[in-house]
Every structure is written in structure tokens, then in C-alpha cells.
Amino acid sequence: MRIIKKPFEYSYSNTVKKALMWTDALIELKQTAEQVSGETYNSCLLNLYHDGNEGMAWHSDGEKDLKKDGAIGSMSFGAERKFAFKHKTTRETVYVFLEHGSLLVMKGSTQTNWLHRLPPTKKITTARVNLTFRTIVE
């Protein structure tokens, strides 16, 4: 696997994003996520949540451009947020708290069997940045 050196486009949630070049700091964070997850990443999606009013609806990351059953590493910076998983068959719901500096790794059949979301909350008044490291197949 190689880091993609030229910008490319990536689509999700009915939007198209144009990739930017890797910075040295981002490469260091990517390498940390790779060491923990055992995956080799070639893309990073950055989401900014200005406060708790912003969140993400139930979904699974099943875009055709992603490596099937590849690990996704999600790093959180800023406000601590509650993150939810819901099993697609049993509807069991599990919550985890994403603290500043934490890394959540979703791997194997997680995307096949579970939905996940970042629920909105009025209790959070500060920002959170999420870096989601992924492997895009070329």
C-alpha cells in the first residue's frame, strides 16, 4: 500500500470531497493509527463538529472505494463525545465515549454487522475534530 501523493476525489453521504496533500503532522498521526490497528492507511477524512448540535446519523462505512473489512481508525481531538453502535440484526446498542486524543478502531465485520453514529447533544459547547483513517482501493 502506498500513500497517494496526488489529490483525488472521494464521495460519501452524497458529497464529493477533493483530497489535500499529507502534512508531516498528519503522517505521524496516521502512523500511530497504523501501529495500533495493524492496517496500512492511504486516506484521512477530517470532520469538524463545531459543538454538540452537530452529529452524524446512523450509517456504516460501506463505500465501494474502501477496502472490504479493512480497519478504520478514528482519532478524536477536542470535546469528549458519546458514540453509539447499533447491531443491524439484534438492534443492540452500545455506547463508548471518545475522549480528546483517543483512537477508536473499527475492523473486521464491524461495518457489515453494525451501524454507528455521533448523536447530537446540547450539553457540548466546544468543538471536536475527528480524523478517520481509511484504506481506499485504487
Question: Each predicted region: which residue ranges?
Answer:
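Non-heme Fe(II) oxygenase metal-center motifs and adjacent flexible, charged/small-residue loops
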Residues: 1-138
